[in-house]
Regions:
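Short coil turns and loop connectors of transmembrane beta-barrels in diderm outer membranes
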Residues: 7, 65, 77-81, 143-144, ...
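Residues within well-ordered beta-strands of beta-sheet-rich folds
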Residues: 2, 70, 179-181
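Outer-membrane beta-barrel proteins
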Residues: 57-62, 166-170, 220
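Hydrophobic alpha-helical bundle architecture
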Residues: 166-168, 179-182
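C-terminal beta-signal and adjacent terminal beta-strands/loops
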Residues: 93, 150-160, 181-237
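Structural signature of Gram-negative outer-membrane beta-barrels, strongest in the C-terminal barrel
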Residues: 2-21, 192
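Transmembrane beta-barrel architecture of outer membranes
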Residues: 131-135, 173-177, 228
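Gram-negative outer-membrane beta-barrel transporters
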Residues: 14-161, 232-236
């Protein structure tokens, strides 16, 4: 859907639903007994010195609902400054709609466990990342100069575990990127910074950090390197 309610203002909306059958994903951790280990060895798996395993499976069906809203406004001031502003909003929610029964071989091997447990069902296959994202971008140009800003808000998200007591919810976060350009003939000189407020994700709790091996969630929508500043030179033919 595209609307132009005012001069220089454009609004677009995209609503979608995506259904996936037999989605490929990793199974939960399956505890292996001696029968299962011998079966793996007899089918080409090398020396096995572990007690659990995961494998890729088509055990689930998923459904994703979402909406993308974008509004863009353009304006030129009397002094020659041109302004371009874009506001965007995204909502995205995924859920598991069906989990297939275990294959017979697992029962035969005595590995009759939940192939897709709570962690995979709600988290890895569901809402591991924020459901809500809001962005505001502004570009100002005047003569050879241009100023760019992009402000993004990521909504909260939850890292799910097999046991609900170990779940961890991460708060919403704002990030700001800034850049300035100067154009001279075919040359463009840029100075900028990403995440200029030096925002870091919240640290994982003791359970999710795997004994301290991981400080931050690998599903954070933004990185854990803090602020990043740069300069670049471009030449346009």
């Amino acid at each position: 859907l595209v609307l132009e309610p005012l001069d220089n203002l454009t609004v677009t909306a995209d609503v979608y639903r995506i259904d996936i059958r037999d989605r490929i994903s990793l199974s939960s951790n399956l505890v292996l007994n001696n029968t299962a280990i011998n079966y793996l060895r007899n089918n080409g798996v090398g020396d096995i010195n572990y007690t659990s395993a995961r494998y890729f499976t088509n055990a689930t069906d998923t459904s994703t609902d979402g909406i993308d809203l974008v509004a863009n406004y353009r304006y030129q001031f009397d002094n020659g400054v041109r302004w371009n502003s874009t506001v965007g909003y995204n909502y995205n929610h995924t859920k598991v709609t069906d989990v297939k029964a275990n294959p017979a071989i697992l029962d035969q091997l005595g590995v009759n466990l939940v192939r897709v447990d709570r962690r995979e069902r709600i988290g890895l296959l569901g809402d591991t990342t924020p459901q809500h994202k809001l962005s505001l971008g502004n570009d100002f140009t005047f003569g050879p100069w241009a100023l760019h800003s992009n402000l993004v808000r990521y909504g909260e998200f939850t890292s799910y575990q097999a046991d609900k007591v170990n779940d961890q919810t991460f708060s919403a976060a704002w990030l700001l990127d800034l850049a300035v350009d100067y154009t001279h003939k075919n040359w463009v000189f840029t100075l900028g910074g990403d995440n200029v407020t030096d925002k870091y994700p919240e640290k994982l709790n003791d359970f999710a950090s795997s004994g301290g091996n991981l400080a931050y969630s690998t599903y954070s929508p933004y990185g854990y390197s803090g602020a990043f500043y740069y300069g670049k030179v471009a030449y346009n033919w």
